[in-house]
Amino acid sequence: MLRSTLSNWREYLTPITHTSTFETTGQLTPEEFVKAGDYLVHMFPTWRWNGTDYNNVSYKDFLPKEKQFLITRKVPCKLRASNFVETQTTETRDVGDGWELEGQSEGERESGREDTKSNEEALASNIEDLQIVDDDESEGGGDEEQLLQNELADDDDDIVDIKPSTLRYYDLYITYSTSYRVPKMYLCGFANEGTPLSPDQMFEDIAPDYRSKTATIEPLPFFKGNQISVSIHPCKHANVMKVLMEKVRASRHRARDTEAQKNAEEDWEDLQSDIDDGLRVDQYLVVFLKFITSVTPGIEHDYTMEGW
């Protein structure tokens, strides 16, 4: 709990900045956090803002009262994190601050500790098929229907026999961390019959590599009560997000180059050559949820539909 207490003091003492450094640091201002939250709620209706129906909320004056935190309830968790680890045979290496990467030799571990940038790139490279679909792209009925069919096919491939005793549910919260200027995730778990999970039980759903370094037991900071949760420490979020943003930019740039080459062969003029291929700040939380799954592999975050 000492770590939690120190974290709370740091949150309290860190000054708020309203100057955007999103593209250079991967950090967000409170205003950008609200924009990203609005986009997440729009694209994924299972997420919502806290609204005005909470009488026990501890408000932060730099955020709108109705947008203090994001919440999605009763997210299923069918398997413990250890089930996912057992299927992996690759080694992992520590990249500092609790993050670990797969497939590295002992020699690479030593050199990796000296190269923070390559560590973050390797962590980001573990996230496959990173694609963001803009609003206008997701409105096409045919494409959306095909995406849904693909998702259902993937779900069929992953069907396993789940015993009721192993099924759990989580309420997930995302709030703004003033000390790191990034989103911060909190998890509150429940057994299948609705009984709150103990901290030790919730830690069973955190990937083993992250339990002692990245996850912290602490009360939900935005409630006046003492509701215990497990938080995901945000110390590396900004750096990893920077790498993921570059990954999105490179992917879009390649796609645009391919389209431009096709247009050139067909004598079409490329009217989109000056479009920025980077990640928009309002799309930040969609990518954030994508890499949070490396910490909570069994929790079925709602990030795989319209926004990808």
Swiss-Prot record:
Q: Name one GO biological process term.
A: autophagy of mitochondrion
Residue ranges for the region (Flexible region) are 83-159
Where is there biased composition of kind Basic and acidic residues? 106-120
* Gene3D superfamilies in the record: 3.30.1460.50
Main location (coarse class): cytoplasm
Q: Does the keyword Transport apply?
A: yes
Listed InterPro entries: Atg3/Atg10 (IPR007135)
Active-site feature positions: 235
Its UniProt miscellaneous note says: Kluyveromyces marxianus proteins are shorter in length and have a more ordered secondary structure than their S.cerevisiae counterparts, which might contribute to the superior thermotolerance and solubility. K.marxianus could be therefore useful as a new model organism for further elucidation of the molecular details of autophagy.
Domains (record comment): The N-terminal region is involved in phosphatidylethanolamine-binding and is required for ATG8-PE conjugation. The flexible region (FR) is required for ATG7-binding.
The name under which this protein is listed is Autophagy-related protein 3
